[in-house]
């Protein structure tokens, strides 16, 4: 009995955030400080946008390589904080684009379950993503690598049930989409 699933892979997101850290902040800020600084800027980054597709072919874009970009930069207004927020917003919008593709295939993701790691450590990113997708986000005490390993072990028959595979995980936080922000 074969099973099929849908994977949303946004190839450029993680590297976009680390590229910004290396090249814009010159690694003077850790990710927690980047998150705090990003949150100091209003939603929409005062017209600054970041397109996070700069790490090769994007599966959800039919394997095209659209590249990354910083759009709308006003040298008299925008600061590092604006770039940091625009980066998180751009990644959240790319995630939304992928969710829209999934919805077009008949999948209705009402809940996003993620490990409490990487960009999901940013309250700004979590709330923005939840608001853009209309999905509840549930954070668990894991990360993507361990989640993938559990999924592979389940598929290989190491675990008998999905419940068994994920039994050790604890839900740490739930983020609901803020209706007022939609």
Over which residues does each language-model region extend?
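Glycine/Thr-rich phosphate-binding loops that ligate phosphate moieties of nucleotide
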Residues: 1-182
């Amino acid at each position: 009995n074969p099973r099929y699933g849908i994977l949303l892979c946004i190839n450029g997101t993680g590297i976009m955030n680390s590229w910004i850290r290396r090249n814009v902040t010159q690694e003077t800020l850790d990710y927690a400080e980047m998150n705090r600084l990003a949150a100091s800027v209003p939603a929409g980054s005062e017209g600054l946008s970041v397109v996070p597709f700069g790490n090769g072919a994007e599966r959800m874009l039919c394997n095209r390589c659209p590249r990354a970009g910083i759009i709308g930069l006003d040298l008299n207004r925008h600061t590092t904080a604006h770039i940091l927020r625009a980066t998180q917003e751009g990644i959240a919008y790319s995630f939304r684009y992928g969710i829209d593709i999934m919805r077009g295939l008949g999948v209705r993701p009402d809940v996003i379950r993620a490990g409490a790691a990487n960009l999901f450590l940013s309250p700004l990113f979590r709330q923005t993503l939840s608001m853009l997708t209309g999905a509840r986000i549930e954070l668990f005490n894991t990360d993507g690598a361990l989640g993938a390993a559990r999924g592979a072990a389940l598929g290989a028959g190491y675990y008998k049930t999905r419940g068994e595979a994920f039994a050790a995980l604890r839900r740490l936080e739930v983020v609901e989409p803020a209706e007022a922000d939609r």
